[in-house]
Amino acid sequence: MIQMQTKLKVADNSGGVKAMCIKVLGGSKRRYANIGDVIKVSIKEAASRGKVKKGDVYDAVVVRTAHGVRRSDGSCIRFDNNAIVLLNTKLEPIGTRIFGPVTRELRSAQFMKIVSLAPEVL
C-alpha cells in the first residue's frame, strides 16, 4: 500500500531513479494506492542524461508493492520494493523499457502498453 510521503523506485528508463508519492489520485479522502492505481509523484533522484529532472511532478502507475496483491484464487504476490512507471498527461509511459516484473492486474486496467514492455508478467 502506497500513501503520501512513500519513497518509490522508478522501474523504467525515463531517467528517474527515486520518487516520492505526493498524492493518491481518485477521490479526496483516498489514502492508499495499490497495484494498478495512478498516483502523483515528485522526482527525488534522477539520472544525469534522463528525460526527467529532480523536482519534476508526474503521474505514475504503481507496478510493484511490498504489501502485495491478493488474487481471487487465494494466492498473494508480494515484492521486495515499491516501484512505479512514470506517465505523461495522456497516461502513456514516458520510458521505452520497463525493469523488473509486473503483475497481471495491470492488464485489466488501461495499461496494456506497460504489460507488453515488461520482461515478465506474474
From Swiss-Prot:
Molecular function terms, GO-annotated: large ribosomal subunit rRNA binding; structural constituent of ribosome
Domain of life: Bacteria
SMART domains referenced in this protein's UniProt entry, alphabetically: Ribosomal_L14
Pfam families: Ribosomal_L14 (PF00238)
GO cellular component: cytosolic large ribosomal subunit
InterPro entries per record: Ribosomal_uL14, Ribosomal_uL14_bac-type, Ribosomal_uL14_CS, Ribosomal_uL14_sf
Record flagged with keyword Metal-binding: no
Keyword match S-adenosyl-L-methionine: no
Annotated GO biological process: translation
CDD domains: Ribosomal_uL14 (cd00337)
Subunit structure: Part of the 50S ribosomal subunit. Forms a cluster with proteins L3 and L19. In the 70S ribosome, L14 and L19 interact and together make contacts with the 16S rRNA in bridges B5 and B8.
UniProt xrefs under HAMAP family: Ribosomal_uL14 (MF_01367)
NCBIfam families xrefs: rplN_bact
Family classification: Belongs to the universal ribosomal protein uL14 family.
Role: Binds to 23S rRNA. Forms part of two intersubunit bridges in the 70S ribosome.
Protein name: Large ribosomal subunit protein uL14
Organism annotation: Ruthia magnifica subsp. Calyptogena magnifica
Gene: rplN
